[in-house]
């Protein structure tokens, strides 16, 4: 028996790998299974050039056994095995990858690829084991060898007995400590869960004896527990199958199996790309909004596989924030991984995949909107807000990608419509896309400022969500048509000459100046209205900050008291206006009373808080008595 030291020169390097490279101890099983899969792959490639070998896939498998009594976890494979020299080279040298060397020497075809590339995965075993024993026999040798190490004081190699070609790895699982329990890695349910999580799509069967309950042979009314060998992994990933082979039910089953949601997917997108970068993806748009979607706890991201092995559960870089509702997975053979295979190097390949996925999602949504509007409306009610946030965020950088996906309720169509639909119906000579804001469609329809615009035949889009107007401010225009709020102080709408005369008369100017003085800075201006028909009063906003935006900003923490510049508009054709003129001429106190009442009434209509509810109540009583 030979005792040797690791060629990486230091015990500290191994400790660093075990304790720092991997973030989760359960990863060790993924690494060992990947190595076993590589060993079988090498056998396959060898058979392509060696006529004396035949590769019958059914003969090749990976076996996992747990021995709780002796605290051992055993893995066996029927792969190519290792010679003594390969044991020294691959297991005696940290960060020496036999699989990487094999890839460089072998032309990889037929859709196979070798998983391993760093030569450190094997050492992940020392995260859970205080001793590792490897017995292996190479296809090139009649002699088997035993490699053994405690991960601290070098390793030993000695001849061993093994009839078949392949490798057996025995992990002597650590004893529990106050901080860590290692018993779980000997539990059947835990081992199965780790295999399903990381290695479900390894191309060779991963077999394990599992406990099953069956009726007794002599008494079917009584059950007994038996050991039964089962294949734990699925092996054939759905994403590598032809789309023509799959039904909607297959995608739904995959969605449920992966626990992407409790609902059914509303839509799936199956992507297979074989170009500058090769990857497969299955993406899902959920039917309903996840309960935590708009909370800080929600994590976006797609599952990321490298050659069928799960690398990341949520790769956030693959999805833009505005498509964060998308679930699914991506599998690629072309990714540059870091040394632990747990994370990606942020390289060109990842960016290319992310860009392509974004394009696929956008294209699918546009197709749904055009061909299945009812389904799209269902999607939009669940996730439309996120698209609007996407328009608003990053200073509108993504508006061109998203503007055609937006829907708003239409005053004339009585349903959700796209901006493209609105523009196609615009009246001849109409220069603006008109919109109104409020808490609900019903309340918006009753707003004073919508009455005249609607009566003149203009379609109005209803904005009922906080983000709507912020998003539109970033859009600014659509198809060269600017957006205009019906509450805007400079609303572009025709008025008759008589109304213009009322507005510009010297007598009215004095009245409005007096009312503005009474309100003492609460409004920027008082004037007659061009948009009121049956309502007496209305508050318009002058400037970039609208009244709806003021409400949203005021509700935020640290709001810095941002307010819209308000203009009080009076309907010159309403009896109230005549009462104001009479009070101006005869009773200054009454004018003050009327002015404050009208201002507070306008605040209430807009859903803004009264500055002094007690005073408002007292003024109402004065009018009544």
Curated annotation (Swiss-Prot):
<comment type="function">
    <text>Molecular chaperone. Has ATPase activity.</text>
</comment>
<keyword id="KW-0067">ATP-binding</keyword>
<dbReference type="InterPro" id="IPR037196">
    <property type="entry name" value="HSP90_C"/>
</dbReference>
<dbReference type="GO" id="GO:0005524">
    <property type="term" value="F:ATP binding"/>
</dbReference>
<keyword id="KW-0346">Stress response</keyword>
<dbReference type="Pfam" id="PF00183">
    <property type="entry name" value="HSP90"/>
</dbReference>
<feature type="region of interest" description="B">
    <location>
        <begin position="342"/>
        <end position="551"/>
    </location>
</feature>
<comment type="similarity">
    <text>Belongs to the heat shock protein 90 family.</text>
</comment>
<dbReference type="GO" id="GO:0005737">
    <property type="term" value="C:cytoplasm"/>
</dbReference>
<keyword id="KW-0143">Chaperone</keyword>
<dbReference type="InterPro" id="IPR020568">
    <property type="entry name" value="Ribosomal_Su5_D2-typ_SF"/>
</dbReference>
<feature type="region of interest" description="A; substrate-binding">
    <location>
        <begin position="1"/>
        <end position="341"/>
    </location>
</feature>
<dbReference type="Pfam" id="PF13589">
    <property type="entry name" value="HATPase_c_3"/>
</dbReference>
<dbReference type="InterPro" id="IPR020575">
    <property type="entry name" value="Hsp90_N"/>
</dbReference>
<protein>
    <recommendedName>
        <fullName>Chaperone protein HtpG</fullName>
    </recommendedName>
</protein>
<dbReference type="InterPro" id="IPR019805">
    <property type="entry name" value="Heat_shock_protein_90_CS"/>
</dbReference>
<comment type="subunit">
    <text>Homodimer.</text>
</comment>
<dbReference type="InterPro" id="IPR036890">
    <property type="entry name" value="HATPase_C_sf"/>
</dbReference>
<dbReference type="GO" id="GO:0016887">
    <property type="term" value="F:ATP hydrolysis activity"/>
</dbReference>
<feature type="region of interest" description="C">
    <location>
        <begin position="552"/>
        <end position="625"/>
    </location>
</feature>
<keyword id="KW-0963">Cytoplasm</keyword>
<dbReference type="InterPro" id="IPR001404">
    <property type="entry name" value="Hsp90_fam"/>
</dbReference>
<keyword id="KW-0547">Nucleotide-binding</keyword>
<dbReference type="GO" id="GO:0140662">
    <property type="term" value="F:ATP-dependent protein folding chaperone"/>
</dbReference>
<dbReference type="GO" id="GO:0051082">
    <property type="term" value="F:unfolded protein binding"/>
</dbReference>
């Amino acid at each position: 028996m030979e005792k040797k030291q690791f060629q990486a020169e230091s015990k500290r390097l191994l400790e660093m790998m075990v304790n720092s490279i991997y973030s989760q101890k359960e990863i060790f099983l993924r690494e060992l299974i990947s190595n076993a899969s590589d060993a079988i792959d090498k056998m396959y490639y060898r058979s392509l050039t060696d006529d004396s070998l035949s590769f019958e896939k059914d003969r090749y498998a990976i076996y996992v056994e747990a021995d709780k009594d002796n605290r051992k976890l055993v893995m066996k494979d029927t792969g190519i095995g290792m010679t003594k020299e390969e044991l020294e080279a691959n297991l005696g040298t940290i960060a020496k990858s036999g699989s990487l060397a094999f890839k460089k020497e072998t032309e990889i075809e037929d859709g196979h690829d070798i998983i391993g590339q760093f030569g450190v995965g094997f050492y992940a075993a020392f995260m859970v084991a205080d001793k590792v024993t490897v017995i292996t026999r190479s296809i090139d040798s009649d002699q088997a060898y035993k490699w053994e190490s405690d991960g601290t004081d070098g390793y030993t190699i000695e001849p061993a007995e093994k009839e078949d070609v392949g490798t057996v790895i025995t992990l002597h699982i650590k004893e529990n400590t106050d901080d860590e329990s290692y018993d779980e890695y000997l539990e059947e349910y835990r081992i199965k869960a780790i295999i399903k999580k990381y290695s479900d799509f390894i191309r060779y069967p991963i077999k394990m004896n599992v406990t099953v309950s069956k009726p007794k042979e002599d008494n079917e009314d009584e059950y007994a527990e038996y050991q039964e060998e089962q294949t734990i992994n699925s092996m054939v990933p759905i994403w590598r199958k032809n789309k023509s082979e799959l039904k909607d039910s297959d995608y739904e089953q995959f969605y449920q199996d992966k626990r992407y949601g409790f609902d059914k997917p509303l839509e799936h997108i199956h992507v297979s790309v074989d170009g500058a970068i090769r990857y497969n993806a299955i993406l899902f748009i959920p039917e309903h909004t996840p309960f935590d979607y708009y909370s800080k706890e929600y994590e976006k991201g797609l599952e990321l596989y490298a050659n069928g092995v799960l690398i990341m559960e949520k790769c956030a870089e693959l999805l833009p924030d505005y498509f964060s509702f998308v679930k699914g997975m991506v599998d690629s053979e072309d990714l540059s991984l870091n040394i632990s295979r747990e994370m990606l190097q942020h390289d060109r390949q990842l960016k290319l995949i992310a860009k392509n996925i974004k394009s696929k999602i956008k294209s699918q949504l546009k197709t749904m909107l055009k061909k299945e509007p009812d389904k799209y409306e269902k999607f939009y009610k669940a996730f439309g807000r996120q698209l609007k946030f996407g328009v608003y965020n990053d200073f509108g950088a993504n508006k061109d990608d998203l503007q055609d996906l937006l829907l708003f309720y239409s005053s004339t169509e009585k349903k959700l419509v796209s901006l493209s639909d609105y523009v196609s119906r615009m009246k001849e000579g109409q220069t603006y896309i008109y919109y109104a804001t409020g808490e609900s469609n019903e309340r918006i329809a009753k707003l004073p400022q919508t009455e005249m615009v609607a009566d003149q035949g203009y379609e109005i889009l209803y904005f009922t969500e906080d983000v709507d107007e912020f998003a539109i401010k970033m859009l600014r225009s659509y198809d060269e048509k600017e957006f205009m709020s019906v509450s805007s102080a400079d609303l572009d709408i025709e008025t008759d000459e008589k109304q213009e005369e009322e507005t510009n008369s010297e007598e009215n100017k004095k009245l409005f100046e007096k009312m503005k003085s009474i309100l003492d800075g609460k409004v920027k201006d008082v004037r007659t209205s061009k948009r009121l028909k049956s309502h007496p009063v209305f508050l318009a906003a002058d400037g970039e900050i609208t009244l709806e935006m003021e409400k949203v900003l005021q509700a935020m923490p640290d709001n810095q008291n941002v307010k819209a510049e308000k203009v009080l508009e009076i309907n010159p054709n309403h009896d109230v206006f005549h009462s104001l003129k009479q009070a101006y001429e005869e009773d200054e106190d009454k004018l003050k009373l009327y002015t404050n009442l009208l201002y507070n009434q306008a605040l209430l209509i807009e859903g803004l808080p009264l500055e002094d509810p007690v005073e408002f109540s007292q003024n109402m009583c004065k009018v009544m008595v």
